[in-house]
C-alpha cells in the first residue's frame, strides 16, 4: 500500500506483539471477581480497566491472537466459555455479578470453528458441539419471538437494582428522563437488552431492543445452526446434521421475509411489535456477509451501500442521521470489531478491492493515532481520523479488538 509506510506498520506490529500478551490474566489474578475463571484469559485492556472476561471482545481478541500464534490462549478462552455455559447456560456479558444478567453477541461457534480448523481435533469438536447446543437452548428458549427470530434481552434482577441501573444510564450514558417508576423499570429492561447487543448504546432499536429481531444476532444464530450441521457431518452424525441444516434454512427464510429491505437491498433490524424494519442503517447489515447467509446478489447490494458508511479513515457504525441523543455506537465512530466484520464479509464474497479500500482506511486511522498518542484505542473517528469520538464514558486505551483489527487489516493488505 503506497499510502501506508512500512516502517509505521512494523512499529505498530512490534507494539502489539509486545503489549497484547499484557492483557492475559492468570487464574490467581481474579481475587475481586465474583465469577472467577478456571483458565487464563484475555481482557480488552492491560492494567485495571475492563480487566474482566468479556464475551464478544474475547472472540475478536482471539482473531488477533491467531497472528501471534497464541493458540494456547485461544483454547483457554474457549474453555472458559464452555465453563460459563455449564454454570449459567450462556456466556455472560462479563464475569462479574453486574455482567451476568445478560449475554453478548454469540460468537463461540466461530471460535470453535477457528480452533478446529487449526487442529483437526475431533474430541475438541465433540466437546464444542455439546456446549454450542447447550448455549443455543438459552437463545431459543429465552431470547426468541414466536416467529422464530431472536432478540436481545436480560435475566431478571431485583426491582431496586434495575431502577438503580436506569438511573445510572440516564445520568451517565444516555439521557432518557422519566418520572414514573414503572416506566423507569421498563426502560431499565430495555437498557439491559441493548447492553446485551454489545452496541450500548445505539440508534438501531429506538430504546426498544426487546421488541426488535436484531440482525447481527440472527446472523450469528444462523451461523451456529449452519456450522453445527457441518460439525455433525464431521462427527458422522448425518441425521443431526440434517436437523441443524433445516433450522438454518428456516431462519434464513424468516430473515429474508421480515428483515430484507427490498428498496435498499439490505437486511435491517425488524420490529416485531410494529411489524416493520428499522429506519436505521448500520454496519449490522454486513453480518449476513460475515456469517455466509447472504446470496451473491444480496452481497452486491451491500457493496453498493458502502458509501453510506465508508469515510477516509474507516467505516462509520451507522449512517449519518439526526438523533435527539448522542450515541457512541453511531456516526462518526468506527469500532474495530465492525471493521473486521465488514472487511472479512466483503472478502468472503469476492469483493477484494472494496475490502482493501476499507482496510486501508481504518489501518491508516489506527497508525495515525498510534503515532500521535503511543496507544491503541477502543474506537476512532472515521471522518477526521482522530480520537474526537462520541463518548458515553472516558475513551479507554484498548488492546483486545483494536489490536486484532489492526493485525487483520495488515493481513488483508499483505503488510
Task: Go through the PLM ranges and name each one.
Residues 2-52, 76-95, 148-212, 250-334, ...:
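Extended glycan-interaction surfaces of carbohydrate-active proteins
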Residues 54-84, 284-295, 339-352:
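Alpha-helical support elements that line or immediately flank enzyme active sites
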Residues 58, 109-112, 218, 222-225, ...:
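TPR repeat positional signature
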Residues 86-128, 396:
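Aromatic/His-enriched, Gly/Pro-containing loop or helix-boundary segments
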Residues 115-126, 228-243, 349-353:
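Inter-helical turn/loop segments and adjacent helix faces that build the functional surface
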Residues 132-135, 241-259, 359-362:
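Short amphipathic alpha-helical coiled-coil/interface segments
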Amino acid at each position: 500500500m503506497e499510502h501506508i509506510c512500512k516502517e509505521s506498520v512494523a512499529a505498530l506490529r512490534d507494539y502489539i506483539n509486545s503489549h497484547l500478551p499484557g492483557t492475559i490474566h492468570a487464574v490467581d489474578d481474579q481475587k475481586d471477581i465474583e465469577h472467577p475463571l478456571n483458565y487464563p484469559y484475555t481482557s480488552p485492556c492491560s492494567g485495571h480497566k475492563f480487566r474482566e472476561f468479556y464475551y464478544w471482545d474475547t472472540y475478536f481478541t482471539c482473531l488477533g491472537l491467531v497472528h501471534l500464534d497464541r493458540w494456547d490462549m485461544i483454547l483457554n478462552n474457549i474453555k472458559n466459555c464452555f465453563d460459563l455455559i455449564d454454570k449459567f447456560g450462556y456466556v455472560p456479558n462479563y464475569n462479574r455479578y453486574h455482567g451476568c444478567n445478560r449475554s453478548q453477541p454469540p460468537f463461540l461457534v466461530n471460535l470453535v470453528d477457528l480452533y478446529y480448523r487449526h487442529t483437526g481435533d475431533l474430541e475438541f469438536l465433540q466437546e464444542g458441539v455439546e456446549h454450542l447446543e447447550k448455549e443455543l437452548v438459552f437463545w431459543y428458549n429465552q431470547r426468541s419471538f414466536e416467529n422464530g427470530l431472536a432478540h436481545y434481552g436480560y435475566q431478571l434482577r431485583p426491582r431496586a437494582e434495575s431502577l438503580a441501573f436506569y438511573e445510572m444510564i440516564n445520568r451517565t450514558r444516555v439521557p432518557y428522563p422519566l418520572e414514573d417508576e414503572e416506566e423507569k423499570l421498563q426502560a431499565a429492561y430495555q437498557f439491559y437488552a441493548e447492553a446485551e447487543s454489545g452496541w450500548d448504546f445505539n440508534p438501531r432499536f429506538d430504546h426498544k431492543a426487546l421488541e426488535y429481531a436484531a440482525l447481527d444476532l440472527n446472523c450469528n444464530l444462523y451461523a451456529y445452526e449452519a456450522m453445527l450441521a457441518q460439525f455433525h457431518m464431521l462427527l458422522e452424525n448425518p441425521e443431526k446434521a440434517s436437523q441443524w441444516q433445516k433450522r438454518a434454512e428456516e431462519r434464513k427464510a424468516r430473515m429474508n421475509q421480515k428483515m430484507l429491505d427490498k428498496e435498499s437491498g439490505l437486511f435491517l433490524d425488524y420490529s416485531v411489535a410494529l411489524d416493520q424494519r428499522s429506519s436505521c442503517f448500520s454496519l449490522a447489515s454486513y453480518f449476513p456477509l460475515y456469517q455466509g447467509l447472504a446470496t451473491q446478489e444480496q452481497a452486491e447490494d451491500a457493496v453498493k451501500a458502502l458509501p453510506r458508511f465508508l469515510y477516509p479513515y474507516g467505516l462509520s457504525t451507522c449512517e449519518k442521521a439526526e438523533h435527539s441523543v448522542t450515541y457512541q455506537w453511531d456516526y462518526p465512530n468506527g469500532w474495530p470489531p465492525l471493521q473486521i466484520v465488514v472487511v472479512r464479509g466483503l472478502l468472503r464474497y469476492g469483493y477484494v478491492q472494496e475490502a482493501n479500500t476499507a482496510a486501508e482506511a481504518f489501518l491508516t486511522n489506527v497508525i495515525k493515532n498510534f503515532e500521535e498518542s503511543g496507544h491503541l484505542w477502543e474506537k476512532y473517528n472515521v471522518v477526521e481520523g482522530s480520537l474526537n469520538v462520541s463518548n458515553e464514558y472516558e475513551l479507554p486505551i484498548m488492546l483486545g479488538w483494536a489490536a486484532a483489527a489492526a493485525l487483520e487489516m495488515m493481513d488483508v493488505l499483505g503488510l
